[in-house]
């Protein structure tokens, strides 16, 4: 009999997770408010459910990958939400990037119904998720984590248990803080090369193999070279949500973040320029506009 797992939220990340789980032999039961997402699930061989509650009643382990606070609260505690599902002992693997206090309220809500919510943000782009190249930062009930190891292995290359509930999100904020800076530094380096008269493809090829490289340089450098941002692995608009969360997290800790604060401005500029639905690599186009370069659209 196939192993069964649930998934709620079948966007860029959720779709990649769902497809990898199906490939690994899991029977996937899923739900998303978008018809196109449900169609993707069915096309991949998954089972469509009527609500988050329906998913939790059909699978003892449920992954949630959601775009924001409102979606999370609706999925957990709204009408037809996971907290209202019958049965006890279900585990919710919560992979979204959200404020810790929001997830903590969700944890309390499901715990009151005899269920467990793990705080498990993932590190990686949508393209990395598609090839199972994610790292999961797991926090919360360690015994529940052990019960979910096979599911985690179905969506990621590595799983890091980081302790008490909320530490997963803290790690994710730090990771995305660096992604924000490294992504912009990649764009800045390529624009510098362009203005120096160097071929962008050559700059990428040489620097990607140098001490100045980074994971973001290697992942987003190629799309910056071609200027193709319309098949996003993470959109500019979604990243603004993360910037707000990380900025508040650092401010609450009175932690100076001069590089992050400076970098964030260019993502806001990208959305203001109409690039909200594009990949965050489009921050390169923002810099090119400032530099007067018209190589890319």
Q: What do the predicted segments below correspond to?
A:
Residues 1-57, 61-64, 90, 126:
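NAD(P)+-binding Rossmann beta1-loop-alpha1 motif at the extreme N-terminus of oxidoreductases
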Residues 10, 98-176:
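Rossmann-fold dinucleotide-binding core
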Residues 28, 48, 117-118, 159, ...:
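Hydrophobic beta-strand scaffold residues
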Residues 52-64, 68-116:
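Rossmann-fold NAD(P) dinucleotide-binding segment
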Residues 132-139, 160, 164-196, 205-219, ...:
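Active-site-proximal catalytic alpha-helix in oxidoreductases
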Residues 169, 215-276:
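Interdomain hinge/lid region at the active-site interface
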Residues 273-297:
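NAD(P)-dependent dehydrogenase/reductase Rossmann-like domain
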């Amino acid at each position: 009999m196939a192993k069964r797992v649930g998934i709620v939220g079948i966007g860029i990340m959720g779709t990649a997770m769902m497809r990898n789980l199906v490939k690994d032999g899991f029977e996937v039961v899923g739900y998303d408010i978008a018809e196109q997402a449900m169609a993707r699930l069915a096309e991949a061989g998954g089972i469509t459910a009527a609500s988050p509650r329906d998913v939790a009643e059909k699978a003892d382990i449920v992954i949630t990958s959601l775009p924001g606070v409102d979606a999370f609260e609706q999925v957990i505690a709204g009408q037809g939400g996971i907290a209202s599902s019958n049965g006890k002992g279900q585990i919710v693997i919560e992979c979204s990037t959200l404020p810790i206090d929001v997830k903590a309220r969700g944890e309390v809500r499901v715990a009151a119904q005899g269920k467990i919510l793990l705080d498990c943000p993932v590190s990686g782009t949508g393209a990395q998720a598609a090839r199972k190249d994610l790292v999961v930062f797991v926090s919360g009930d360690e015994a529940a984590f052990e019960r979910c190891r096979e599911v985690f292995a179905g969506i990621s290359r590595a799983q890091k248990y980081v302790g008490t509930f909320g530490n997963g999100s803290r790690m994710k904020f730090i990771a995305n803080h660096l992604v924000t800076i490294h992504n912009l530094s990649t764009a800045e380096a390529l624009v510098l090369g362009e203005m120096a008269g160097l071929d962008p493809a050559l700059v990428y090829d040489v620097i990607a193999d140098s001490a100045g490289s980074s994971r973001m340089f290697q992942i987003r450098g190629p799309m910056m070279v071609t200027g193709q941002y319309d098949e996003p692995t993470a959109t500019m608009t979604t990243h603004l949500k993360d910037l707000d969360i990380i900025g508040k997290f650092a401010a609450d800790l009175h932690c100076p973040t001069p590089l992050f604060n400076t970098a964030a401005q260019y993502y806001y500029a990208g959305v203001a320029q109409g690039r909200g639905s594009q990949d965050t690599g489009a921050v390169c186009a923002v810099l090119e506009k400032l530099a007067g370069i018209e190589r890319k659209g």
